[in-house]
UniProtKB/Swiss-Prot annotation:
Function summary: Molecular chaperone capable of stabilizing a range of proteins. Seems to fulfill an ATP-independent, HSP70-like function in archaeal de novo protein folding.
Chaperone as UniProt keyword: yes
Chief subcellular location: cytoplasm
InterPro entries: PFD_beta-like, PfdB, Prefoldin
Name of the protein this chain belongs to: Prefoldin subunit beta
GO MF annotation: an example: unfolded protein binding
UniProt GO cellular component terms: cytoplasm; prefoldin complex
Quaternary structure note: Heterohexamer of two alpha and four beta subunits.
Family recorded in the similarity comment: Belongs to the prefoldin subunit beta family.
Lineage, uppermost ranks: Archaea, Thermoproteota, Thermoprotei, Thermoproteales, Thermoproteaceae
Amino acid sequence: MAQIPPSLQDLVNRFNQAQAQLQSVLLRKQQYEAELKEVEKALAEIEKLPQDAKIYKSVGNFLIPQTKDAALQELKERKELLELHAKTLTRQESMLREQIDKLRDEINKELGKLRGGAQEAAKGGS
C-alpha cells in the first residue's frame, strides 16, 4: 500500500480545518439569527404598547424599570449589531465554501495523479 504524499496530506488537513471553521461559522450565524428573531418579536410587542406602559429590563437577577423609548432604542441598537454580525458571518461562510471547493478540486486532482501513477506501476510490473 502506497503512502499518502505529504502534499496530499497537507491538502486534506487544510480541507478538514476549513470544514470545521465552516461548521463553527454556521453555528454562530444560526445563534445570531435566532437572537435577531427574538429582538424583532420584542420590538414588535413593545411598539404596540402605550407610551406610558411599564417596561422592565432583566439585569442579572433583577428587573429594572425602563421607558418605552429607552427599550425601543436599546432593542434597535441590538438588532443593528446582530444584523451586522450575521452579515459578516455570511461573508465568512461564502469565503470558506469557496476555499473548501478549491481544496476539494486540488485533492481530487492529486488523487487522480496518484491513481494514474499506480496504474502505470501496475502495468509496468506485469
